[in-house]
Amino acid sequence: MTPAPEPGPRWLTESEQDAWYAWRRMFPLVNAEIARDLTQDSGLSEADYDVLSVLGSTDGHRMRVSALAELMRWSRSRLSHQLTRMEQRGAVRREGVATDGRGAEVVLTDAGVAVITEAAPLHVESVRRHLIDALTPEQLRTLAEVGEVLRERLGARRKV
């Protein structure tokens, strides 16, 4: 009788290792370039832009704080600090929920709408320059498919 193979790590094949290293090298480089452009062009951080763009895409430009934290996969503490900074700049405000004394909503202000409206075209151009225009349509489809598979596997509910 042949003994069962010893349990151990499932080492990466050469092609798997190539894919892993490509991801590890590519993502931070592309992200850093886009984040740098965002800050230079609009004065926004990635976190600012993420909050503004999510709120800007909701009905009434508002969302429960707890739902926003869950959607963004941030701790409530991290979101609270981010919202405090954004409130100080007048981009958002927090309001109590009339039907729930414990709940709070974050609301995009008119100033916040103006900021995201001005920043979005510049941000899209940066995304195009550093990612979209570098890839063929087929590569973009593959990237989108890979992203969706990983998001589903990790339980993500919405694009942020």
Where are these regions (language model features)?
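N-terminal positioning helix adjacent to the helix-turn-helix/winged-helix DNA-binding module
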Residues: 15, 47-49, 111
